[in-house]
């Protein structure tokens, strides 16, 4: 039977089909996770504000994400008369596409990675740097001063904190000696990097909040002053694509935190003997980081814009650079640099 099926189509078609199935196996659970992250956010923040959160649609409100998605799907997409239509529609598509393609190099378990490339960290850094273009395009194409100001704020914010994230990544990579994300995880078999690099872990979490435009760094969407920021003119599915892209980027930041500092798919506290797949541990760690993101949103007030810039350039950048020099010095002094000779 297998030989018959193989003979029906050329080998390259089968390879293409396998790749498509692998992509679907990543994208479909990711979209479901994004949908239920919105539900979890409303439940967690509701509990912190002594409310119930969504509890009407389905048991315990579990069908609320489906209702929200259906609502956005059936609404009309309104295009502003003075907008550049091609760029206006292309911006949310670009944001959503970049949020998805970043997951190609994420190792979910040992050997469970779509593209196991040797420069996985550089790939992720490049994709995250491109994300700002979608927001700038949206702000400019809307032909609205509120959207344009939101886009400019977002560009400045993301670029500012990407510099610190870059130095944090270099410090971790010096400890590993490889740009491959699977190697980063296996290097933590004896000790997770959260122990030697704990200050970097805190910096990475806070920089991740700023990079994904989450509270208390949600200046681009400052509804108190900019109505809704760069997406003020968007509605229906174009708005939904921005929404999905933002939450997919949040999950990506959780996955990166898990891989760089929390041992990726490895079991915590010496529980590796339990018959629990590495994928489950990886997902649980992402959920833990997401809870921190939601907790911060419910707890802290929004930063003023000058405070945000000062924190990025005058605190995070010098400290991450100092830690990079310290890491390199310690590794060199004790002969701990990996892959020597």
From Swiss-Prot:
It catalyses: a quinone + NADH + 5 H(+)(in) = a quinol + NAD(+) + 4 H(+)(out). This is NADH-quinone oxidoreductase subunit H. Its main location: membrane. The chain crosses the membrane at residues 16-36, 86-106, 119-139, 165-185, 191-211, 254-274, 276-296, 315-335. It is a multi-pass membrane protein. InterPro entries: NADH_UbQ_OxRdtase_su1/FPO (IPR001694), NADH_UbQ_OxRdtase_su1_CS (IPR018086). It comes from the Bacteria. The lineage of its organism: Bacteria, Pseudomonadati, Pseudomonadota, Alphaproteobacteria, Rhodospirillales. Belongs to the complex I subunit 1 family. Its EC number is 7.1.1.-. GO terms for biological process: aerobic respiration. It is found in: Cell inner membrane. GO terms for molecular function: NADH dehydrogenase activity; oxidoreductase activity, acting on NAD(P)H, quinone or similar compound as acceptor; quinone binding. NDH-1 shuttles electrons from NADH, via FMN and iron-sulfur (Fe-S) centers, to quinones in the respiratory chain. The immediate electron acceptor for the enzyme in this species is believed to be ubiquinone. Couples the redox reaction to proton translocation (for every two electrons transferred, four hydrogen ions are translocated across the cytoplasmic membrane), and thus conserves the redox energy in a proton gradient. This subunit may bind ubiquinone. NDH-1 is composed of 14 different subunits. Subunits NuoA, H, J, K, L, M, N constitute the membrane sector of the complex. Keywords: Cell inner membrane, Cell membrane, Membrane, NAD, Quinone, Translocase, Transmembrane, Transmembrane helix, Ubiquinone.
